[in-house]
Design a protein with these regions (language model features):
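Structural alpha-beta junctions
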Residues: 36-40, 66, 204, 238
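N-terminal amphipathic/basic-hydrophobic helices that include classical n-h-c signal peptides
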Residues: 1-2, 252
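Negatively charged, low-complexity tracts enriched in Asp/Glu with abundant Ser/Thr
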Residues: 2-61, 116-188
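A compositionally biased, intrinsically disordered/low-complexity signal enriched
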Residues: 31, 48, 56-60, 93-100, ...
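Low-complexity, compositionally biased segments
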Residues: 55, 59, 81, 189, ...
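Ampiphathic alpha-helical segments that act as solvent-exposed interaction surfaces
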Residues: 91-122, 209-258
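C-terminal interaction module
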Residues: 155, 159-235
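Intrinsically disordered, low-complexity regulatory segments enriched in Ser/Thr/Pro
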Residues: 65-106, 186-222
Length: 258
């Protein structure tokens, strides 16, 4: 969504936001003034979305190298929410900040690359997305496997998942579940290579196993989960499935992590 210039009626009511009274209710100016008073240099800021009297909330984007932060100001009540986003993840953390001072402190910590777990200790009201934390701590592989193994049976065949988890070459890859199919990747985030194999349900016949960049007609039928896993392993690229970490412990591979 492209920002639109703010008009004279875009400002917030200083009676609702007394901390914006020196700025005539302008949240952009208020963030800049508060940051300067705290000795903080904010990343580039700009209006986010429409900026007019009908817009609720009124939003500001702070574009740091770590990811875009969106600060939302509710128009009719004093409520400031902060969303910290990462590419391909979306929200990495969210918070309802009590004051502009707290908002700027959060933004400063984010753009200075303060780890998410440390930010959570400093600001207990910060809600951190588990995958974002796992990715930052080098636990994305074990987290993804735990997540996939916990999925209900109507989402993915659990026997197939457990058979894949028991296979070291597959356990070293990131599992991806989509439309009841189980695929794999060597990266925790998109773009995922189409050279890795996938097992797709084939009704009562079991699975069809093949590379994601192949036509379904070229896929190999597999009657049971063990047979499907054997086919998946045979189709791994030569550089795929190498042990970079274990789902039973931490790993340091964060390839393609922004």
């Amino acid at each position: 969504m492209k920002p639109e210039p703010g008009g004279p009626n875009a400002a917030l009511d200083p009676r609702t936001y007394p901390d914006l009274a020196p700025d005539a209710g302008d949240p952009l100016a208020g963030l800049g003034r508060t940051a300067a008073a705290q000795g903080v240099t904010l990343a580039p800021t700009r209006p986010w979305g429409r900026w007019d009297a009908s817009q609720d909330p009124l939003s500001v984007a702070v574009e740091s190298d770590r990811g875009v932060c969106v600060v939302e100001f509710a128009r009719h009540r004093h409520a400031v929410s902060v969303r910290f986003t990462r590419p391909w993840i979306g929200n990495a953390a969210t918070a309802d900040a009590p004051t502009l001072h707290d908002t700027v402190a959060l933004l400063d910590a984010w753009q200075r690359q303060v780890p998410l777990d440390e930010m959570g200790r400093r600001w207990p009201y910060l809600a951190i997305e588990p995958f974002a934390l796992a990715l930052e701590q080098g636990r994305a592989l074990s987290y993804r496997w735990q997540e996939v193994r916990s999925l209900p049976a109507d989402t993915i065949d659990k026997d197939l998942v457990e058979a894949a988890y028991a296979s070291p070459p597959l356990r070293a890859l990131y599992p991806i579940v989509s439309h009841a199919a189980l695929a794999f990747s060597d990266t925790p985030l998109p773009p995922h290579s189409a050279h890795f194999p996938r097992a797709t349900p084939d009704g009562e016949h079991g699975w069809l196993v093949g590379r994601q960049d192949e036509y379904a007609s070229a896929h190999t039928p597999a009657a049971g989960p063990d047979e499907a896993v054997d086919a998946l392993v045979r189709l791994l690229p030569e550089t795929g499935g190498e042990e970079r970490g274990s789902a039973d412990g931490d790993e340091t591979d964060t390839k393609r992590t922004p």
